[in-house]
Structure formats: structure tokens, C-alpha cells
Regions:
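Glycine-rich, often acidic-flanked micro-motifs
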Residues: 1-4, 18-140
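Conserved lysine of the Walker
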Residues: 10
Length: 140
């Protein structure tokens, strides 16, 4: 699951994975995650600018927080760093205390269920190779 602010390259990275590794793209912009039982990613009926929105679900293997960079670098995040970065990409109204507390609780469950990586990347196949190498190294 790629996560990043708008215009960072989620659709680009997903397209690279589809082109070079045969990955299936659920949505080019947003996805829903279900945590009861095995964590699952679901396509949502909103495509954003990508035009890609499929009504399918897949197991959640990991979360990749994207940023643009002139060179590819990846690192697996610890729980506290992941928890500090993930809320930037979650839907929650921080002014509503109960909603924000529930969101943080869900994010804690999420980072317990799936590893979180930070990938600073280029918009080419080298980014795919960098992430793939880390996933294989870590047994995913």
C-alpha cells in the first residue's frame, strides 16, 4: 500500500509495479484498510486523478510512505516513527477528539499488523528494484 500526499507519485509507483512486476492496482489515489482478521486493502469507488478504482480486495503486506528523491533510499520504520508519519495520510478531523483518538488507535493496530517503510524514490524502475530488494530481504 503506497501512502503519500497528493502529487508525490503513488500512481506512478503503482504503474511501475504493474508494468515491471505484474502488480494489480486497486486505486490510484485512496484505499480502505480492514484490520479485523488478516489485514486487507480494499479498492474504493473514488479514483481521484488516476481514474483507477477497482472493487477488489487483497491482503495488506506492507505500507510504503513515499517521497520524491534524486536517488532511491528505503528504510523500515519503527512503530513510533511510523505512528508519527502515518496520520498525515489518514482521514480524520483532528478537531473532533473522539474521531482523532479512534484514528490513532486504528493506526496503532495498522502498524502492528503490517511493516511500514519509507521510500524516497525516483519515478522509474529503480524504485521498484529498491523496494523489492528490501521486501525480499525482510521476508516479504
Amino acid at each position: 500500500l503506497f501512502s503519500a500526499p497528493s502529487q508525490t507519485g503513488k500512481s506512478t509507483q503503482a504503474a511501475l509495479w504493474a508494468q515491471h512486476r505484474g502488480a494489480e492496482v486497486l486505486n490510484g489515489d485512496k484505499a480502505a484498510v480492514r484490520l479485523d482478521g488478516a489485514p486487507t486493502v480494499h479498492g474504493v469507488p473514488f479514483s481521484g486523478t488516476s481514474g483507477i478504482c477497482r472493487n477488489v480486495s487483497m491482503p495488506l503486506r506492507c505500507i510504503v510512505l513515499l517521497s520524491q528523491a534524486p536517488e532511491n533510499r528505503i528504510r523500515r520504520l519503527g512503530a513510533s516513527e511510523a505512528l508519527a508519519l502515518l496520520p498525515q495520510n489518514a482521514f480524520a478531523d483532528a478537531s473532533v477528539r473522539e474521531e482523532w483518538q479512534r484514528t490513532l488507535s486504528l493506526l496503532l493496530d495498522l502498524i502492528s499488523a503490517a511493516p511500514v517503510y519509507a521510500l524516497a524514490c525516483t519515478p522509474d524502475v529503480r524504485a521498484v528494484e529498491t523496494l523489492e530488494h528490501a521486501l525480499v530481504r525482510d521476508g516479504f
